[in-house]
């Protein structure tokens, strides 16, 4: 059976939740392989609306959920999220959710350091969610992280906490922030251990068995390619790799397990927080897109910045992310707009570039090169076949395919799960 990997092709918030939910109903296993509880999905199933940040989306469809070792896990946030969905009738148990025993933990000191650093940056703040994701990844790379498996070994926790506090308390004190005590953290971790450890296992074994048995595996990415720590708009990025290649390291599977890679992109562009956004419309057009698209972050509640579709940016995401097909969402938001613009490149100091350069100063100076395309007066909302779309809307989609050098294989025309036009089944063998 074919596997599918879903990743964002812009700066996140592309509508991955709906597409993941739609595909999860046909998968056997749904796997998170990077990120933490800093990105959210909103899923509507029947009369229930689920807001997930850490749990794999497939759980709401009764599928096995797996959190891989590439995810940084806040145990308090995880248990709170499990509690919320249980109150909604979703029974999350160790039989339905498995977590990599070597996944790093996010502790309260990580969030404290995150907040203290952002405050110290002032006008140069990155715009993190303040949930400790970055500091937790730093500890993983520096070999001082506390991992889920350590919860079973108090003697290991003892010396790991010494190393962790030496580093973090030094930084916190230097930033004028309160420091942490070892005894309190130890008590918290020992209290969490019996609640977290029943979910833990070497998930690479389970995924190897799933692959061997022919199960369909859906790998669920968080954030998006242009927030990738290597390939995104650095330093205004997340702290993990978000491209499809990350599933091998972040889930403990071989690179061939990715299967078909589906990138998700809105029919326009949005971004939360700081960072370059060449096609941003800080005007009435941007406000109109935000109002129509209900552009507020699931996790932060922050209003998203809005602008025209940036084909040069998405083309870059297609190439570095290994994207083989594009799911285009929120096409209906553009209904009734007489003229549309598509970013096709960037102008920097008289030079035109087909891609966004890596340098922060160059990115800040980048001015978009636009191609103008006629809009449409009819409605695309709720369309479930190409025959239901206005001719000009089809032309818009076709032009995007040409510019990003990737076929649009799925179109979403409303938040409703079934308002989807499928041109190519990503699970097809």
UniProtKB/Swiss-Prot annotation:
Quaternary structure and interacting proteins, as annotated: Homodimer.
Annotated binding of GTP, by residue: 12-18, 40-42, 304, 330-332, 412-414
Cofactor(s) essential for the protein: Mg(2+)
UniProt cross-references to SMART domains, sorted A to Z: Adenylsucc_synt (SM00788)
Function: Plays an important role in the de novo pathway of purine nucleotide biosynthesis. Catalyzes the first committed step in the biosynthesis of AMP from IMP.
Subcellular location(s) of the protein: Cytoplasm
InterPro entries named in the record: Adenylosuccin_syn_GTP-bd, Adenylosuccin_syn_Lys_AS, Adenylosuccinate_synth_dom1, Adenylosuccinate_synth_dom2, Adenylosuccinate_synth_dom3, Adenylosuccinate_synthetase, P-loop_NTPase
Binding site for IMP: 13-16, 38-41, 129, 143, 223, 238, 302
Principal place of residence: cytoplasm
Keywords, in A-Z order: Cytoplasm, GTP-binding, Ligase, Magnesium, Metal-binding, Nucleotide-binding, Purine biosynthesis
GO terms under biological process: 'de novo' AMP biosynthetic process; IMP metabolic process
Entry binding sites for Mg(2+): 13, 40
Lineage top rank: taxon: Bacteria
Catalytic activity field: IMP + L-aspartate + GTP = N(6)-(1,2-dicarboxyethyl)-AMP + GDP + phosphate + 2 H(+)
Cofactor note: Binds 1 Mg(2+) ion per subunit.
GO terms, molecular function: adenylosuccinate synthase activity; GTP binding; magnesium ion binding
Binding locations of substrate: 298-304
UniProt protein name: Adenylosuccinate synthetase
Pathway assignment: Purine metabolism; AMP biosynthesis via de novo pathway; AMP from IMP: step 1/2
EC number: 6.3.4.4
Leading EC class: ligase
Signal peptide: none
Active site positions: 13 (proton acceptor), 41 (proton donor)
Gene: purA
Entry's family note: Belongs to the adenylosuccinate synthetase family.
